[in-house]
C-alpha cells in the first residue's frame, strides 16, 4: 500500500498532463514503473512526516554529542597523560636530588623517599660510629676500653676466677698481659691461680705495654734450647696436645718462653687446644 502522499501526487500529475501523453503505471513487485515512450515524469520528492524525522534528528544530535563526548574524553585523557608525565618528571627530579645529597629542599618537597634517604645518611654515620666503637673496644675484650690514643691504658678491674680461667685466657678477655696480671697480684707462678681468687687486672693495655714474657722462667734448664729459651736446637719440633696441656705449661716443660711457642703457631687458638691436636715448636736456625 503506497503512502497517501504519493497517491495524491500521482493524481495531481495525471490531471495536469496533456491528452497526447500517455502514462502507464503498474505495480511490479511493489515498485512504480514508467514506460520508455512516456513523457518524463516530474521529479518526485518523498516528504517525510515530522514525526518520523524527529527521531532521526535526535539520533543525529546524539551521535554528534557522542563524538563530542569521545573527543572531550580523548582531550581529557591527553591532558591527564601529559600531567602524569609531568608529575613523573618532577618526581624523578626530586628523587635524584634526595639521593645525591640528602638535599634539605628535597625534604621540604615532601618526598617520602627523600626522607628515607636522609635517614639512611644518618644511619651511615651511625654505622661509622659503630665501627669506631668497635675499634675503641679491645679486640677480644667485649666492653673493655683502653689505649684509644696509643698511650693511655685502660682501668684496673677486679675479676673472680672461675673454673677454666688461666692468666693467658684472661689476657685475651681484658686486653692485658700475663705478667701484667701476675705483677699486679704478686703471683709467683703465672700457671697457678685458684677458683674463687679475686684478681686485679690491668685492662685495655697498649701493645707496647703488654708483657707476656718477663715473669715466665724456664722450670728446667734444657741444654737443647738457646740461652734465651726461644728455640730448640734439635727436634722433635712438633707436639701432640694431651688433655690439660697449655702453651704456658708446654713452654715451661721444655725450657722455652711461651711467646716463642705462640709465634710458631699462627692461627692456633692457644686458649682452646684440643686433645690430639698437633702444634709446632720453635726451631733454632
From Swiss-Prot:
Knockout consequences: Does not affect the virulence and the proliferation of the fungus in plant tissue.
Note: In plants, chitin acts as a microbe-associated molecular pattern (MAMP) that is recognized by lysin motif (LysM)-containing plant cell surface-localized pattern recognition receptors (PRRs) that activate a plethora of downstream immune responses.
Keyword tRNA processing: no
Gene: slp2
Induction: Expression does not seem to be up-regulated during plant infection.
Protein name: Secreted LysM effector slp2
Segments of skewed composition (Gly residues): 117-139
LysM domain boundaries: 157-201, 237-281
Compositionally biased intervals (Basic and acidic residues): 85-116
Amino acid at each position: 500500500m503506497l503512502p497517501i502522499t504519493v497517491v495524491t501526487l500521482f493524481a495531481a500529475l495525471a490531471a495536469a498532463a496533456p491528452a497526447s501523453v500517455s502514462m502507464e503505471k503498474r505495480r511490479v513487485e511493489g515498485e512504480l514503473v514508467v514506460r520508455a515512450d512516456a513523457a518524463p515524469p516530474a521529479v518526485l520528492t518523498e516528504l517525510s512526516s515530522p514525526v518520523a524525522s524527529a527521531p532521526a534528528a535526535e539520533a543525529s544530535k546524539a551521535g554528534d554529542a557522542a563524538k563530542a563526548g569521545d573527543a572531550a574524553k580523548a582531550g581529557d585523557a591527553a591532558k591527564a597523560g601529559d600531567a602524569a608525565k609531568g608529575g613523573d618528571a618532577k618526581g624523578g627530579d626530586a628523587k635524584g636530588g634526595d639521593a645525591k645529597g640528602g638535599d634539605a629542599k628535597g625534604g621540604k618537597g615532601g618526598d617520602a623517599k627523600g626522607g628515607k634517604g636522609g635517614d639512611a645518611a644518618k644511619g651511615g654515620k651511625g654505622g661509622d660510629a659503630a665501627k669506631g666503637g668497635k675499634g675503641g673496644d679491645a679486640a677480644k675484650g667485649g666492653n673493655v676500653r683502653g689505649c684509644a690514643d696509643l698511650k693511655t691504658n685502660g682501668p684496673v678491674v677486679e675479676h673472680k676466677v672461675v673454673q677454666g680461667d688461666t692468666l693467658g685466657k684472661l689476657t685475651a678477655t681484658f686486653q692485658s698481659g700475663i705478667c701484667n696480671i701476675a705483677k699486679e697480684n704478686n703471683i709467683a707462678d703465672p700457671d697457678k691461680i685458684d677458683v674463687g681468687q679475686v684478681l686485679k687486672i690491668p685492662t685495655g693495655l697498649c701493645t707496647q705495654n703488654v708483657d707476656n714474657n718477663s715473669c715466665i722462667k724456664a722450670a728446667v734448664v734444657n741444654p737443647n734450647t738457646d740461652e734465651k729459651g726461644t728455640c730448640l736446637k734439635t727436634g722433635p719440633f712438633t707436639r701432640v696436645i694431651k688433655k690439660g696441656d697449655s702453651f704456658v705449661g708446654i713452654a715451661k716443660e721444655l725450657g722455652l718462653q711461651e711467646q716463642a711457642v705462640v709465634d710458631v703457631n699462627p692461627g692456633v687458638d692457644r686458649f682452646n687446644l684440643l686433645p690430639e691436636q698437633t702444634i709446632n715448636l720453635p726451631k733454632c736456625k
